[in-house]
Amino acid sequence: MNNFDLHRFSQALKCYFMTSRRTWLRYFGIFTLVLFMADLFFTRIQGHSFADMVEWWGLEGAVRTYTSYVEGTAIFGLVFFFIAMLFGASFLFSHMKETRQRTTYLMWPVSNLEKYLVPLVHNILLLGIGTLVAYHLADALRVLLDWMTGRTVIWGSPWFWDIFTRPFDGSVPWEFTAFIVGFFLWFHSLYILGGSLFRRQQFLLTSMAIVVGFFLFVWTVHALVEGSGITRDINFVGWHDGVWHIHWSVYLILVVGYGLIALNYWLSYKIFCRMQVINNKWLNV
């Protein structure tokens, strides 16, 4: 089956969700617990108690300091969201670890593209939405605990969304927004590629490969720049006379970067198409 059928794809999505819903619920519970414990750490364990802050700096100073603690929970929640998305990307095909699971999934009456897109869509949508809901639920539990113990009620959700949407509010050039989105998609595509390539310990091996590749890239670029005598005094972004000035190399980097991102996703799909039912190797090729 080589053609893509939307109705068949939607039925496969529904079937995949029904068979994996317990896993998603378990992830949601774990994420909520981790984020709630992190909220308690930032607001109650590190720093000073609220009563001591009121005694030392007065109510206004205590609220101002406690607000900075809550902002810390929002920053942690945002970092946790991105790490969770990368972690999920590396385990895109975790439902195919065993031979029986692999045989069952590869025999689904859908095309290879549909088999590839089903876990990808679930991974992006369910994991992304689930992590966001888990953060807000953990924030609500912290606020409830603050209210029950007589603390000032300060929500962390507004700061979370302010940081999350800041690159898209028009206050920065669209090139900067494209770079931020591309930076995340680049790592997401790498972890999906690693999750497709490695059969075991996908997240760990992919992370190690990225670190090694990064150091090799930096060393190679440094050697080329030093050997060629190319000037490093390039102002990629400048602000002059109320106007942003973007160097032409930024657009070249964006085009090449998004091209490599598309290549990573395509390679991941090709590796998936070559997966074998019986495989005891560390790689899926």
Language model: regions and residue ranges:
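Hydrophobic alpha-helical transmembrane segments of membrane proteins
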Residues: 1-103, 112-285
